[in-house]
Amino acid sequence: MSKSSFQNRIIRAAKLDSNLYEEVEADKGALWQAMAVVIFSSIAAGIGIGLKTGGFSGIITGSIASLISWYVWAYLTYFIGTKFLPEPQTQADLGELLRTIGFSSSPGLLRVFYFIPGVGVLVYLISSLWMLVAMIIAVRQALDYNSTLRAVGVCVIGYVIQIFVLVLIFSIFGGTLPDAPD
């Protein structure tokens, strides 16, 4: 796949193009692209926060954490969506969820603008909500759902489980959860 096709996929994912999510669901070769979108989105957030706070030490750690989180999130949505809340036509594998959810991170590229006084927080908030909507579409398409509400349910259940696991990990190994950007 050419560079322009990859860029086109990122743009289509950000435009919430459901056909794009079907396309990457079916393209087994798109896993590396999906991973790159997750990394780029994480780096963009790290740069935006770093430019505002004056520190860039968390970019690598944040990127690694984003990759782990992406995998865990894809597994949770796969498991919940195929085992607990499937529709009759639901047929998916973990790779399909990894690819679609990875591309749903594309609006997060805008988080690079977090440092801009007066609008940065708004850009960060809007891009985060945009990513959530993209993720719901990605989950709906990957799990072959007719119901967007069911995809929302899978995302909410997965989110609650992931937060519980994070709190458990931090309480066992120490440390605190990171603060949200202000």
Question: What is each model feature region?
Answer:
Residues 2-92:
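Selected alpha-helical membrane-embedding segments in polytopic membrane proteins
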Residues 44-51, 134-140, 168:
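Residue-level signal for alpha-helical transmembrane segments in multi-pass membrane proteins
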Residues 52-53, 85-86, 115-119, 144, ...:
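Short helix-capping/hinge motifs at transmembrane helix termini and TM-loop junctions
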Residues 164-182:
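Juxtamembrane boundary at the C-terminal end of a transmembrane helix
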Residues 56-80, 95-164:
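Selective recognition of hydrophobic, aromatic-rich stretches within alpha-helical transmembrane segments
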Residues 27, 93, 144, 179-182:
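Acidic-enriched, low-complexity/disordered segments with a strong bias for Aspartate over Glutamate
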